[in-house]
Amino acid sequence: IVQEVSNDYAVGLAKFFKEAFIKLTGDENSIVEIANYQTGDKDFSAILTNIKAKNPDAIFAPGNFTESALLVKQARQLGIEAPFMGGDTWETQEFIDVGGKDVEGVALSTAFDREKATTPEAKKFLDEYVKEYKGEPSALTAMAYDAYLIAIDGIKRAGSTDTVKIRDAIAATKDLECVTGMTTLDKNGDPIKGAVIKTVKDGKFTFLDFVEAK
């Protein structure tokens, strides 16, 4: 794991990945290295030299797009061939522009891809968006629309303009058809749903797989 310690989102993803991976493998030592860097860093040679010596099967590095692209690029220059995995912050054109051919084949998790636009709500959203904006919606756009759907559904179920009732109704969201899939909110307000896995192929983000939530 290579984490951007000044980025709370990246640190959170690294924490959840570590916990899930150790649980999945049943091996407390399955994570061979946890390396840290700061936002804005550009030279990762020291980190990567240490990682190369550990010879990992894969590297999870959920940081910002620029730093992550440089990290992957420098890893390839050092001869590290292990696959890289990241989060949705990688899904920007800048990541591909900075990383170039070196980011081909990486894997990243995100929330939306047109190939998984399987619900009627998703198909409706995709058709209307493309018609209006002449382009593909990003995962952030899809999630923003989901937030709208969740809020509207909560208001309808609350049957009131009382803010507490609306809040409680939203918190109780269960099996709501959204753009990114059927959505249920847990006790923390986080959505329980699957994740889209993408890769970079021929300089473009490409659908790879879909992982159901368990």
Question: Can you say where each PLM-predicted feature lies in the sequence?
Answer:
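Periplasmic-binding protein-like
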Residues: I1-E4, N55-N64, L71, A82-G87, ...
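Solvent-exposed loop/turn segments at secondary-structure junctions
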Residues: V5-Y9, Y37-K42, N64-S68, T89-E94, ...
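Short, surface-exposed alpha-helical segments at coil->helix boundaries
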Residues: A10-K18, T119, K123, G194
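Structural motif
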Residues: E33-N50, P120-E121
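An alpha-beta-alpha
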Residues: I1-A35, A58, A151
